Amino acid sequence: MATGGFSTKQAGINFWNSSYTEYVMTIFTFIAGINFALVYRAVTGDFKKLLHNEETKWYTAIVLGATLLVITGLYITDQNGSFEDTFRRSLFLVVTIVTSTGYTGDDYVAWGPFFTTIFLLLMFFGACAGSTCGGAKIDRLVVLAKNTKNELYRVIHPNAILPVRVNGKAVSHEIVSKILAFILVYVMVLIAGSIILSALGLSMEEAFGSTLSCLSNIGPGAGSTGPAGNYAFIPDLGKWTLESSCSSADLNCLQSSFYSHLTFGKTHNIVEDKYFLYICI
């Protein structure tokens, strides 16, 4: 539930070699990616808030869609086992990466560039705001996508008034601007870190994957820093750069100071409550 990714065994998840263990971990890791305020509402019997929540729907769709792509890719490249085995391995990897848990029972880098691309996108997306997961957060990306759609519509209809709405509630222009600023800073840090690591001799795949992994608090990156590798070979300046990327990820902590309003005496649905505007900052 903490999406930390550490294990009591050096071999990690592979130590148990148990499909049952992987399914249980997948379920609880997926739940950990949901806004905790919504999880609380579900535990107290109000499942409608969880099931009808727009961000939860997007989160579920991304997980299922990415899992389907991975399964399809494994079958096309003839790297699949039985259907159950392929489904379990794919779902586990997708959930553990999108929630920034970082457990990897398989080396997606060895599967090929197609799979690495999928998991890098999941690292960037992250799970829902109000969870312990890293990444840009789906809630912010939903607001960004809707705002982009509105701006494209205004190109044709300049006088149109189209507020960004989440679960039927309008999001103020001020909050949209702050979300755009957050995403911009996130991307700028990602680009800067990738350039520095590239200058130190890392391939573009390794530089980008390593920076994104640290920025989103994932763990495994891409190339030599993927699930089968580590960060030991990176020069000291590169390690300092990655540590700075990890510190930049603490921008997400800004939402935590406001999250207490939801968990202590304020149990309103996050996307129907005014505090949603702060949690998306």
Where are these regions (language model features)?
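Membrane-proximal intracellular helices of multi-pass ion channels
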Residues: M1-I281
